[in-house]
Regions:
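Rossmann-like NAD(P)-binding element
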Residues: 45-100, 119
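Short amphipathic alpha-helical segments
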Residues: 16-18, 39-40, 76-81, 100-101, ...
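Nucleotide donor/acceptor-binding cores
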Residues: 1, 86, 147
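NAD(P)+-binding Rossmann beta1-loop-alpha1 motif at the extreme N-terminus of oxidoreductases
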Residues: 1-44
Length: 147
């Protein structure tokens, strides 16, 4: 299965490493595929994944996993290009950092999943993989790592 992981931070990196180790074709979609952060992740995974632009990876994937920081989520979705008929697993949380610490940006009258579905018109969005910290998302004990 070809999995595009949009965002190569803590959550995306942990999920991608687990799935690559299980033999899935993991493609990390990032703003700058040549950035040291993306290249370091590939080295850590051991060459079992690749990195490209958000549009490239979304176009070639069977399933898209959205793992961006909330403030970058709308831009990331708009960068995917044509996603009609695609399946998106939304692992985001609508959190922002402010002067008083971390705060919920939305979720009082509309959910983050509803916002993502609105931005990802034509795709099927499933809210998933967003309730555990990234430290719990990888390794042999993680249920989703066995996909």
């Amino acid at each position: 299965m070809k999995l595009a992981i949009i965002g190569a931070g803590n959550v995306g990196g942990a999920l991608g490493a687990s799935w690559a180790q299980k033999g899935h074709d993991v493609l990390f979609g990032v703003r700058d595929p040549t950035a040291e952060k993306a290249q370091a992740l590939l080295r850590a995974i051991g060459g079992k994944a690749s990195v490209g632009t958000v549009a490239e990876t979304a176009a070639s994937a069977d399933i898209i996993v959205l793992s961006t920081p909330w403030p970058a989520t709308e831009t990331a979705i708009r960068s995917m290009g044509n996603i009609k008929g695609k399946i998106i697993l939304d692992a985001t949380n609508p959190l922002t950092r402010g002067p008083d610490g971390i705060a919920l940006e939305i979720g009082h009258s509309i959910s983050a999943g509803e916002k993502v579905q609105g931005w990802a018109s034509g795709a099927s969005v499933f809210k998933a993989l967003n309730t555990n910290g990234f430290g719990n998302t990888g390794g042999a004990a993680a249920d989703h790592a066995n996909w």
